[in-house]
Design a protein with these regions (language model features):
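Gly/Ser-rich catalytic serine loop of serine hydrolases
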Residues: 543, 547-553
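N-terminal glycine-rich phosphate-binding loop for ADP-containing cofactors
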Residues: 1-488, 493-495, 505-539, 549-550, ...
Length: 731
């Protein structure tokens, strides 16, 4: 059975190799990072050390201290370390001879059975292995990470015909569960999936723009937001990747693909525009400029110099854009139709199901929807109408009702098939299907599971946008002690948010000099009572936290017995932006934790945390408790929470109300406006005084202070601004 690994080695300390090593360290793996020795000076490990230092500067490590888990070395003096590790990754230069020489050294020094993988993005596995031993072939695979490894969740995995089942299982476990990646199993074809498809899209976008006389900034607007493409667009992405890589990456695919492949129709390597930029050294972010210089200038090939960017506007709907008859619409239609045709024509060669291509484009290139999902959302009949002779896979999708129809996905052979399952990834909608609804309202439902390993346990599911805490939600929580459950997990399928906070509309309506202060006080008290209900329920409550947990959502996390939290979840208290401080006993729970942890000056520390509006990655939070689990995979937080609540249920006793010390010290917010200072003064009233305060006394302090500060016109204006525009008002 696969298990977590403790040690690894990465050979090659460039941007990718050092990035992989850094993210291994994020996952708690001790890493040996090896590169060629420096010839001069005493520090022969300088290249590897430079790789570590670069990752520290680029925030490849989630916490700076994780860099201590990476030991630098070199490939002459330290190959013996390979015999100590559980996994070896090759990330050296994309040269077959260099890689084969590296593999020979690895095979001579590794423990028998140690998995070895290559991070190649261009060389087929069959070519890589060459004359490797049978034992090496059984332990070998390709693990193609995307840069930067901390951020990009996609890993393309290629197994060979001789790769053992044990190695495949182990690699999937480490990549998915331990390192938090989404593994797409690929065939051993040129460019695998993401670069084969993504590079083609970029080439089509560039060549079509040049041929149609579409300006770079015009192209990036046209095939940008309407299609769910990141704001870089196509030309901005070339700058980001580095234009100097075009001859190597795009050129290598041209050499690897047969002349019949449509890739050859979009040979940007030979385009004068790319040659011009390369000749001038305008390579994008690796230089001072590329297609763009800064944010306001773009290269004009006719003039041979940079000019101010022009402003172009298009609508949000891709179909309306493609039918608009405008230059932008005609360009977008040509790019999209060419791209979706290539995806359809290529799918049988590179993928088993179309969702593999969609996942690759979403996680490898940042698209909101993959090309096949996009085709379904635009309308499969319309997409088919773009062709006189539609690709066979597109015709199959039309006949099936879409690439995704009836809860299934189209295989690359044109047949509908079940969506593949990833081990340990639980969809809440499927989990609660058939479960008993024991409580709920329009904004949330509490389910009691009746079958399987989690029978008797409950799931709290929001139904509000971004899982916000409306009055109906907080009222529902007040009844938590009444629910007949073994334990409760707070979970949902909304990847963007555990809970984005309180219902801002209510605050905006009730606050201000003319607002209903009594109703405002009741609303705040109900929030306190609701979260208190979650805390004192006679069963454990566990949060499955991913996306964001902000404001009232983070206060709810603090009221759970424990949570399983994605390391990159953004957590914090932005209440100051809405004219308030966290007032649902978040201050109480945070102070309680800090006191229990023995933090010096806990009131001042809590004060600073509660008024810092900037969310931080959960991995950087220092007040998680013993039972809280911070993991790398957002897709496994639900499973983790269910397992944790089962463990906590045995012999569970609800926590008692607390009595906490107050402080006689000065707590003041001095950096902001008078409005910010007023919020700081209000929060200080909760924490300051002589002796101690009970839970009820602290609750009343919060209600009084929050109601008073929200009477101010300036604070009301902040609440209205956030509720109506989602933008903070710095008044």
């Amino acid at each position: 059975m696969a298990k977590d690994i403790k040690t690894a080695a990465v050979l090659g300390a460039g941007s990718m190799g050092a990035g992989i090593a850094a993210h291994m360290a994020n996952a708690g793996i001790k890493v040996h990072l090896l590169d060629l020795p420096l010839d001069e000076g005493d520090n022969r490990d300088g290249r590897a050390q430079n790789g570590i230092d670069t990752q520290l500067k680029r925030h490849g490590f989630q916490r700076p201290e994780y860099a201590k888990l990476v030991t630098p070395g070199n490939t002459e003096d330290h190959l013996d370390r390979l015999g100590e590790v559980d996994w070896i990754v090759e990330a050296v230069f994309e040269d077959i001879n260099v890689k084969r020489d590296t593999f020979a050294k690895v095979d001579a020094h590794r423990k028998p059975g140690t998995p070895v993988s290559s991070n190649t993005s261009t060389i087929p596995l069959e070519v890589l292995l060459g004359e490797a031993s049978d034992e090496f072939k059984r332990d070998f695979s390709i693990t193609h990470f995307f840069n930067p490894p901390r951020v990009m969740r996609l890993v393309e995995y290629v197994e060979g015909p001789d790769t053992s089942a044990e190695v495949n299982e182990q690699m999937h476990h480490v990549l998915e569960r331990q390192m938090g990646k989404v593994v797409v199993d690929c065939r051993d074809t040129p460019g695998f999936i993401a670069n084969r498809i993504g590079n083609f899209w970029m080439a089509v976008g560039a060549k079509t723009a040049f041929d149609q006389g579409i300006k770079p900034e015009q192209a990036d607007v046209a095939f940008g937001r309407p299609f769910g493409v990141p704001r870089t667009g196509i030309f901005g992405l070339f700058d980001y990747v580095g234009i100097q890589l075009v001859p190597g990456i795009w050129g290598s695919l041209l050499k690897a693909l047969p002349s019949s492949d449509a890739y050859h129709d979009y040979n940007i390597v030979e385009r004068d525009e790319f040659k011009t930029l390369l000749d001038k050294g305008f390579t994008g972010r690796t230089a001072e400029s590329g297609f763009y210089r800064g944010r306001e200038e773009v290269y004009d090939f006719a003039a041979g110099d940079y000019r101010p960017k022009e402003k172009f506007q298009v609508g949000k709907d891709p179909k309306e854009l493609m039918e608009s008859g405008t230059p932008e619409g005609d360009y977008a239609k040509e790019v999209f139709s060419t791209f979706i045709k290539y995806c359809c024509d290529t799918a049988p060669e590179i993928a088993d199901t179309v969702d593999q291509i969609d996942i690759a484009m979403k996680l490898g290139y940042g698209w909101k929807k993959g090309p096949f999902e996009l085709a379904d959302s635009i309308g499969i009949d319309y997409v088919a109408s773009l062709f006189d002779d539609a690709p066979s896979l597109l015709t199959a999708a039309k006949n099936a009702g879409g690439f995704y129809a009836d809860g299934k996905v189209l295989g690359s052979n044109g047949e509908l098939t079940d969506l593949p399952n990833r081990e340990g990834v639980i969809r809440v909608a499927e989990l609660v299907a058939g479960a008993e609804e024991i409580a709920g309202n329009d904004d949330a439902t509490v389910y009691k599971l009746t079958e399987g390993d989690y029978a008797g346990f409950g799931v709290f599911v929001y139904k509000t946008p971004m899982n916000s805490n409306s009055n109906a939600v907080t009222e529902l929580w007040t009844h938590a002690p009444e629910w007949d459950l073994k334990g409760l997990v707070i979970a949902n399928d909304e990847e963007r948010a555990f809970s984005a906070g309180a219902d801002l509309g209510t605050l905006a309506k009730l606050s201000g000099p003319e607002g209903d202060s009594e109703e405002l006080a009741r609303t705040i008290k109900q929030g306190i009572d609701g979260l208190h209900g979650a805390r004192v329920a006679p069963y454990p409550v566990v949060g499955a936290v991913r996306g964001v947990a902000l404001g009232g959502g983070m206060e709810l996390v603090l009221h759970t017995d424990a949570s399983v939290i994605h390391a990159e979840a953004r957590v914090g208290f932005p209440e100051r932006n809405v004219g308030l401080f966290p007032a649902w006993s978040g201050p109480v729970r945070l102070l309680e934790r800090l006191v229990d942890l023995g933090v010096p000056n806990p009131h001042a520390t809590a004060f600073g945390v509660l008024l810092n509006v900037r969310p931080v990655p959960a991995v950087n939070v220092d007040f998680w408790r013993e039972h809280d689990e911070v993991i790398q995979s957002p897709d496994h937080v639900v499973e983790g929470a269910l397992e944790l609540v089962k463990k906590l249920a045995d012999g569970y006793t609800a926590p008692a109300d607390v009595e906490l010390p107050l402080t006689t010290g000065t707590l003041a917010y001095t950096d902001g406006s008078e409005t910010d200072k007023a919020i700081g003064e209000a929060l200080a009233k909760v924490f300051t005084g002589d002796g101690t305060a009970t839970e009820d006394e602290l609750a009343q302090r919060q209600v009084d202070a929050a109601t008073e500060v929200l009477k101010r016109q300036e604070n009301h204006d902040r609440a209205v601004s956030m509720a109506t525009t989602r933008k903070p008002l710095n008044n």
